[in-house]
Each structure stands twice: as C-alpha cells, then as structure tokens.
Amino acid sequence: MTEKGLETIMVEYLRNHNGYEQGQSADFDREYTLDPGRVERFIRSTQPDKVEQTMCFGPESQRRNFFRRLSDKIAADGITNVLRKGFRFNGLLFDLYYPIPSELNPSAIDFYQRNIFSVTRQLHHSAENTLDALDVCIFINGFPIITAELKNHYTGQTVKNAIKQYQDDRPATDPLFAPRRCAVHFAVDDEQIMMCSELKGKDSWFLPFNKGVNGGAGNPWRESKILTEYLWQEVLTKDSLADILENYAQVIEKEEEGKPKPVKRVIWPRYHQLDCVRKLLFETRSNPIGQRFLIQHSAGSGKSNTITWLAYQLVTLVEDDENIVDSVIVVTDRVNLDKQIRNNINAFKRLANIVAWAEDSASLKEALQGGKKIIITTIHKFQFILDTIGGSLGNMNFAIIIDEAHSSQNGAMSADMNIVVSGNSENEEEDIEDHILKIIKGRKMAPNVNYYAFTATPKNKTLEMFGTPVQHPDGQTGHIPFHEYTMKQAIEEGFIMDVLRNYTPYKSYYKIIKSIEADPEFDKNQASKKMRGFVERQPQTIKEKSLIIVNHFLDKVIGAHKVGGQARAMVVTSSIIRAIEFYYAITKQLEEMHSPYKAIVAFSGEKEYCGKMVTEAIINGFPSSEIEKKIEKDPYRILVVANKFQTGYDQPLLHTMYVDKQLSDVKAVQTLSRLNRCHPKKKDTFILDFANDPEDIQRAFQTYYKGTSLSHETDPNKLNDLIEIVEDANIYTDEDVLEFNKLYWTSAPREDLDAIINRCVARFKDELSEEQQIKCKSAIKSYVRTYPFLAAVMPFISPEWEKLYHFYYYLGTKLPKLAIDDWTEGLIESIDFDKYRIVEQEEVNLSLSDSNAEIDPVPVTIGGGKSEPQMESLSKIIENFNTLYGGIEWEHADTVRAQIQQLPALLAKSESFVNAVHNSDSDTAQLQCNTDLFQIVINMMAENTEFARNYLDNETFRNFVNSRVFQQARAIV
C-alpha cells in the first residue's frame, strides 16, 4: 500500500461512511485561505436574510471585502473562536457553524445538519509554490480545520517523515499553516499518529495521538487492519469532530514575561484526554447519580485540562430537559487551577461567568445561590466550608472532582462533605440514634453525588474508595482505576521525561571522635541515628554539599547549555532550617565564583533562624506569590525547597534536582516527577541524590509505572480486633460509652464529657503497665484513624462502631503521651565532628520493569511494643559508626591529609592542566587533571605509600580526590 493508498482509504471512508463532501484543490482560495464557495453556500442556506441585508456576496467588491475581513478575523482570533462566536459584518452577526443540539429541537437539528463537512486531497495551498500539495485537509463550512500528512511503512516512510515534512516544508508564513488558522495538524502513518496545534518550523512540537497498548506507547495490533484507522472511523466522524470543536479545542491567552500582549495558544485534546472525558460523560449519562470514578493519569499528562473539560461538560449534561448535575465542585491543592479553569471555560461560547472561587462559607453560599455552575475550592478551606453551610443541599445533584485524590480525601473530611451535599444535616428534633445513623450515612458516599478522583499515584485508600470493584477468582474483591494513562505510556510517547534515566547517588563518609575521657554506654541503634543527624547538620557538611551542587549546576547544567541555556534546578531539603542553610551556602558559593545566577528559598510559615523569625519573603526580598514567576527569569536559577513545590508544580524549565531528603513511596514519585515536564529544548534530566538508596527510589516508581490495582478490600472485622485489645485493658465500661454518647449528641457541656473521659484516663494511668499502655493507646489511635475510611466504603452500618469512634477520639486526646525512653541522653555532648567527605557514585539508569503493580489494602494494626535498648560503650559505638560511614581508616592520617592539601598547588604547576583549563571545556580539563594527578601521586609514593596505594586501588576514593582537587586547582590558575 502506498502513501496515496492510505490517503484514498481515509478520504473514501470519510465520504462513504461519515457523509463528507469531496472537495477539490481548485475550490480553495489561497488569498483568503478558505473555500469561498462552501462558505457562501452555508451562509445562504442558513441566514438568507442577513445575506440580503448586508449584500455580503455581491457586488464583487463587497464580496471581496467580506472574505478579506473574515480571513483577517480568523488570523487574529483563531478558527475555533470564530466558529464558536461568529463574525460581524455591516452590523450583523453571521453564524459560521451550528453546534450539536442539546435537546430534540427540530429547528436546531436542521441547522446542525446544514453544516458542510468536506475533505480535500492533494490541496495546492501555496501561492508561491503552486506545485506543493498537502495530502489531506478537512473543512467545515468551507473553513480549513485540520491538515494531515500521511506516510506508509511499506514505502519506507513513517510518521517521523511526516513530522519532518511539516517542520521543513510547511512554514508558518504560509497562511494555511499560520498560528490558529487550523485547529490541529496531524502526522499519520499506518501505525502511529502525532499532532501539533501550532507549527513553528524546526521547533514544531508534535505530541502523540495514540490509543496506547499494554500500558505503553503505540496502538493495539489488529490483524489485516490499519492501526490508525480510528482517526477517520472514530475521531473525525461529524458528531465527534463537532464535539471536539465545541467542547475541547480552544485558543487560550497566557501572559509571558517581556511580551506586551498575552500569547495565544491553541489547545487540542490528546487521545487519552478525549477518551477519558467521553467515557466519564457516557457513564454519568447512562447511570443514576451516586457513581465513583478513579482516573490514574501520569504526572504531567495534562490533568488540569482534562479536569477543565470534564467540569465544563458535566454542567451541560441534560436528561429530559433537566441538568444531571446542578453544580460541579472541584477540590484541589493548586490555587492556580482556579485561574486555569476560568480562562479555559471563557474560551467557550455557550456558558459565560459560571466559575466561582470559594474560600469561605459566605463565598460558597453566594456561588450556589448565584447559579455558579463550577465552584473551585482548596482542600484547606473545604473543611471550614462544610462545617458552616449546613445541610440544605440534599435536593440538588453534585459532581465532585478531586484533584490528586490521595491528598484530598480523609475519612472525617469525606464524612462532612457527604453530610453537606446529601442534606444529612443535624435536626434538633431527631433522637440520638437517628442522628447517629445520619452521621454514619454521611460517612458513606452521598447518593446525590458523583465523584471523579484524579491522581497519578493512587494509594490503597484511594483505590478502595474510588476504584472500580472487580471480582477475583478467589472470591476477593479488588479495585482498579476506571481510566488509565500510565507513566510508562507517557514516557514512551515522549510526553514526559524519564527522570530516572540519569540518576547519580552520592555517599557520605563521616568520622566522629570522643570528646570526653569517660566511656558511658548508650543504645547503639538510637545513637547511630542521632550521630548521623549530628554530622548532617554540621556547617562543613552543608558547605561540601553546596559546593557539589553549585559546581555541578554551573558545569554540567549551565555549561552544557541544558534546555537551550534556560535550565533551572531544585534543591530538596529535609527541613526549613536545612533549606535556609543550603540557601545561604549556595548563595555564598555563587557569589565567590562570581556567577550571575541566584537562588530562591521556599518554605511555608515562619521559622526562627539565628535568633530572628524569618519567612521566605524576608529572605528572598520579594513576596511569596512571586516565587513561581521569579524562578522563570534570570538571575534566578536554583530553587531551594522545604516541603514546598514538591507536588503539583509544573515548570518545564526544571532540569536538575539535588535531593538531600529521604523520600519513599508516593513522596518519592511526586517529588522527582517535578522534573518530568517536557520542553522543546529539553533533551534529558538529572538527579543528584545525597540521601536515598537508588533501589528504594526504583521500587517507589515501579508501583506507579503501569497500572496500579488494589489486591483486595479491607476487612472491616479488623476493627473488632482493635476493640478487643482496648476492651481487654478494662479502662472503660459499656455504660461509660453509652453515657458519653448521650451527652455528646445532646451538646452537653464539655466538663460533663471530661468527667467520663477522666475516669477512664485514671484507670489507664493507675492500672496498666507501661507495655499495656502502649498496646491500648496504639489500638485506640489505629481505630480512630481507620474507622472513618472503612465507614465510607463498607456495605453495612454499625451504630456501635460509630459510638466507639467518638468515644475513642476524645479518650485518645486525653491519654498521656507515652515517653519513649531516650537511651542517648548526653551523647551529642560527648562527641565531636572530625572528618566529612562525600563521594560521587556511578551514574545509573534506574530502569523499570514492564509490569502492573498490586498493592494491599490499609493495614488495620497496632504499633510495636516497647523495644529493649541495646547498650554499648561510646567508644565501641563510635568505632562501629566510623567503620560504617567513615570509608577508609588511615594509619597515618596527618601525613595523608598533608599530602592531599599539597595536590592543588602541585597540579597548578602543570602546563598541560593550565592549558586545558584556559582553552578547553570543563570535561576535557577534568580528564587532564586526572592524568596529571595520577603522575603526581606516583611521585609522592617515596614519602608515604598509604595515600598512593588507596588512590591507585580505590576507584571511589580516586574519583573523590580528582573531583575535589580539580575544583581547588582550577580556582587558582
């Protein structure tokens, strides 16, 4: 099959099965970049009175004026906006397209059917190069909407050749390929489809428009079928294309630094976004309200746009002339999602001013009463809103869209949300039992709400609460996402970067010494952890790591012109104090190296530092709200963070991450995934990790690389196990629980509740051993943590469990804090910091296996009991610590130290090294350094063989010395 053969199949299908007209290249007017004959035919067919009043198609001068103004309007506003909003000429508004009717209105159906869909092969589009022809162009009412270049494997050409053709031979100076003139450009072969919404020559960025196969890139294999035929058989049907133009495609405006006017960008949905929203809308329309959907879409996959399109279309869904949902509530941690949704929806014509931002109860009430259809709120404000507005909404239907569901749903908050939207609010005339039953029902998913939970990293609670139930052969019920766009597919399609491809761990080596004559004993396990923390917070440690960070960033990132010279870096620290220390150390290093670049520190709240209370704004010298914009422009290049910007932060310029914080599971994936956003000039990423084992990072990513499912549901009877543990302690009676709940549900004074709780606390203190106290309190805490979640998902209700929940909750807050014996008291005062060094390990590609992950449900267990200390003498603890973390133990340490200190000066005398520094790049100079140092060390063997032997035999040590001496010697030549 030739390229023309694929073209024939596509065009013939559109004509014979989708009702397209066959256009001719001669129909196309190159001056106006449209098909004037079909434009005129459509307008005369639908608006003859306006044609007569304006005389827009005659005389000829008027006709030319009409088409010239129309063409200019499309060039300025974009074809999608002009089709939606129409075109004014001589005081009248001309409709250029009629949307899909939302109800059975014969007139609306008739006008929609008058839209003219046409397809033209071999379109000679260029006035300058009249022989050049585009393979396929799709028109609606005479306006070009879609272009396509087709290739075929059988002729030795693929989608890559089609992309190259667009980049080389389809310049934006040609009106047909100018920005916003067409909605999208497709590069197609018989196996893959790529799309580009704005051509920019060599910088044209094509994204995949494939279905995906087995959780990865590509399209499902179909014997004797063209793998890409879904484009013309499914996507380009009249109703489907009309739906995309009306509800997805848009031109949005975004302000960019240094540009006087907002930059207009064309948005076209990718296949997984289109597929996801359409399937969700179908299920919403086909089933009664009260459904739950979990959408597992990879970080960086465009969840914000998917949420926007879903929210907008949910409020327009109609059944029997009534809205299926009255309002959509979007719960998010990202404040900027409000502006994004508002801007996106403003691009649509049919609904205007429908989005509200609710940050307190008053604004939420105002939004609901004012008919706002989409209400956005953050998780931090949602609790207050739900507690305040009462339960008068039970007669309304809601859709609740949860952005990053794992962080936005806990049992107690879910219960309050369900109570409010279901109308299960407090009623003073109810008896206690009735009210408890309503609270339990409120914990369950409200019957008048559909939940749409989006996340890239679903936890077990999220899967069980929102996932689709599936029956396993063993009778257990698991849960799976309703829709998936996996990390694997996103990486393979080139939509996000593989952040684990260039991962370099660093290993720290420390040595500490005893600072007292005595040799006391401490718990060796507690001591080792405490000593490592002591070393890690030493100024020398921060200085060494900061030097590595700055040198690497300047040499390997800035020096290598990463992201076209625009690369940014993030330093992830373990605490606010550590972030501040790193910020000042990095700032000092940059200044000493006379670098033009600066760092920014980011943390929440205020913190005492050097005797003063400081905030990020005080340290940075500008408001916190400006951090995201500041880091995008020079001189700011390095962002130092403490538990901030580690989730939901979308910055394509971010190229390198320096990690000095232990990360695990979801936190590891979320944090490192900040690097995965693509940029046309971003070819790779880099992670330099001071704190984590590469295998732990690899294991965390593997869980969310492909599909993630829940193995089986949580067994509610595990709660009975916890209750039995608490009851065995005999610190309360059944009468205590009943009396407490009676008082609690009748809003009795706090002192009446305390009288009951205090009796139980007294028994806890007086009658239980320390081991029993630990076991009892752990069971109470586990019950309080687990019950709200289980109550939301279990198929039955238990008033007794609900009563115990409230009783345990208050009891748990009053129980004394159990002291964890500190068997290291006085340790820090007994030691001193002696040596610290940090060594680069081998760079690795943390590849992931092609397999789905299955995770277990929420564990319903208590913590471990009291552990016995393992006492050892301080000298032995120090010996073991230095052996574990100290690397080489030197016999003649002072001599070795003196030899190492000589090396920079000796190296600086080498002409070959000096020439390399002044005339070569950093990598070449480092290689010359390594060569010259090798000879210098050989020459030093006569003095002391210990240093030379370790340098020659220990590659890790040799690399450390080479790197450090290179930096020091370069600074003096």
What do the PLM-derived regions correspond to, one by one?
Residues 21, 35, 41-47, 51, ...:
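Catalytic cores and motor modules of nucleic-acid processing enzymes
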Residues 674-703:
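Conserved segment of the helicase C-terminal RecA-like domain
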Residues 346-387, 391:
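Inter-Walker segment of RecA-like/P-loop motor cores
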Residues 532-641:
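Conserved C-terminal RecA-like helicase domain
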Residues 1-327, 336-351, 380, 395-397, ...:
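ATP-dependent helicase/translocase motor core
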Residues 372-404, 408-419, 426-427, 432-441, ...:
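Conserved RecA-like ASCE ATPase "motif II neighborhood" in helicase/translocase motors
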Residues 410-499:
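Post-DEXD/H (motif II) to motif III coupling segment of the RecA-like Helicase ATP-binding lobe
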Residues 222-227, 232, 461-566, 583:
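Interdomain helical connector at the RecA1-RecA2 junction of SF1/SF2 helicase-like NTPases
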